[in-house]
Structure formats: C-alpha cells, structure tokens
C-alpha cells in the first residue's frame, strides 16, 4: 500500500482485501458466477485447483471441469460455465494460458465484475447475510458506520458504472530482464498521471488519460527513450 502511494502519488483508502480462501466463500455466498472458459483455460485450472484441494482437504480432482464438455473443440473455443468458488479462484489464478500475466489480471477483473453482477441480484436481507458471512474474512479500513451506510445505499451504488484501469498502460513501460527475472519497467511519471487523471480528474478511461498527458507534456517527449519527461 505504502509503495503504491509513494510511487503513484495517490492515497489508498476505503479498501477491502481478502485472501485466496475467503474469496472462495464470497463466490459461494453469491451463488457462483457465470464465466466464458476456453478448453485451454479449463485444462490449466487443474494445477491451481490441485493446490487448493490439498489445502481444503478435498478429494483429488474435486471440481475439475469435465473434458467431455470440450469434446471436439479447439483450445481457444469457449463454453459458458457456472463456476463455484473453488473453480472461480483457480480461473482467477491461472497464469500460463494465453498472454501470461496480462490475461491473468484480465481474468481477475472479469471474475470481480461477475461477483458484482451476482450481488446486484440479491435483496437487502440477502446482502446482509452476505456481509455477515464475508466481513469477518475481509481486511478493510472502513469503519462499522461506513459499512452500514454502504449497505443501506447498496442498491443506488450498484447502478454506478465500474471503471477499470491497468497499470502500466500499453506503450508506457519496457520489458526488461533484471537479475534473471522478467520485469516491467514502467514510465512512472506517465502512469502516475493516468491514475490521478482518472481517480481525481475528469478522464473516464485510459485513452482519455493518455491523450491528456501527451497534450500536457508534448514539449518534454524524449525520442531516445520513448518516454515523456517528468
């Protein structure tokens, strides 16, 4: 948290953080989620699910997606499935299918979006039950009063649009190998600006933020590095 605040010039507050296995309970409490899953993803989910089953003391192979579902399909072909908590966690953790960590973070955003979608179907009593179930498993800086206010106004908040932002943004980082490790070296000045434009400013998406940043910093562009200066 402190590292992100220092490097990107933002204040992180009103956050909620859960661990792997609390995440399973959250998905189960909303009744599972619908997700488009490819044949390659279903196969790749088996490795993280094996780790989860061992931790949860489940029988080996529990919740594996049947190969029969994808009979005759290519690795890229997708099927809409209803995932339980164990399966949803494995799907969100999946890294070595597709474009590495980029697709993994995309899957994580898709899963979170679907959890929100399912939560919108709950009535006030069900939402209260959900909170009573998951709040003990969530680490947050929200006060009890703020949580109560969120619950009372939940139906209004659920009508809000959800904005997503991936950092570092395309074109504003370099791929490097440092100490034999693959790392992304971001243009911190640009990416900090993108976050601040969207969180605190008037930009609604990364494209608007990039355009605004380029307009404000055109005089300071380096053709040697491909970066806009500080």
Enumerate the predicted regions with their spans.
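Solvent-exposed, acidic/flexible segments
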Residues: 1, 16-20, 81-85, 101-109, ...
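Solvent-exposed, polar/charged alpha-helical surfaces in well-ordered, non-transmembrane soluble domains
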Residues: 2-6, 13, 21-28, 90, ...
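Surface-exposed patches in mature extracellular/periplasmic domains of secreted proteins
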Residues: 12-19, 37-39, 123-130, 206-210
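A mature extracytoplasmic/lumenal domain signature
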Residues: 16-22, 31, 39-41, 169-171
């Amino acid at each position: 948290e402190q590292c992100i605040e220092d490097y990107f010039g933002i204040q992180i507050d009103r956050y909620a953080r859960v661990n792997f296995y609390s995440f399973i309970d959250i998905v189960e409490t909303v009744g599972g989620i619908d997700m488009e899953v490819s044949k390659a993803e279903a196969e790749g989910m088996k490795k993280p699910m094996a780790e989860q089953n061992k931790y949860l003391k489940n029988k080996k192979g529990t919740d594996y997606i049947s190969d029969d579902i994808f009979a005759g399909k290519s690795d890229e072909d997708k099927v809409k499935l209803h995932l339980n908590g164990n399966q949803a966690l494995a799907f969100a953790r999946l890294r070595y299918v597709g474009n590495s960590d980029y697709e993994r973070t995309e899957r994580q955003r898709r899963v979170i979006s679907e959890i929100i979608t399912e939560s919108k179907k709950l009535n006030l009593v069900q939402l209260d039950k959900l909170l009573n179930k998951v709040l003990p498993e969530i680490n947050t800086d929200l006060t009890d009063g703020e949580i109560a206010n969120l619950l009372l106004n939940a139906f209004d908040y659920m009508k809000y649009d959800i904005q997503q932002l991936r950092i570092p943004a395309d074109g504003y980082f370099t791929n490097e190998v440092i100490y034999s490790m693959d790392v992304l070296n971001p243009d911190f000045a640009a990416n900090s600006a993108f976050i601040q434009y969207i969180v605190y400013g008037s930009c609604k998406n990364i494209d608007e933020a990039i355009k605004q940043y380029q307009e404000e910093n055109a005089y300071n562009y380096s053709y040697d590095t491909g970066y806009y200066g500080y």
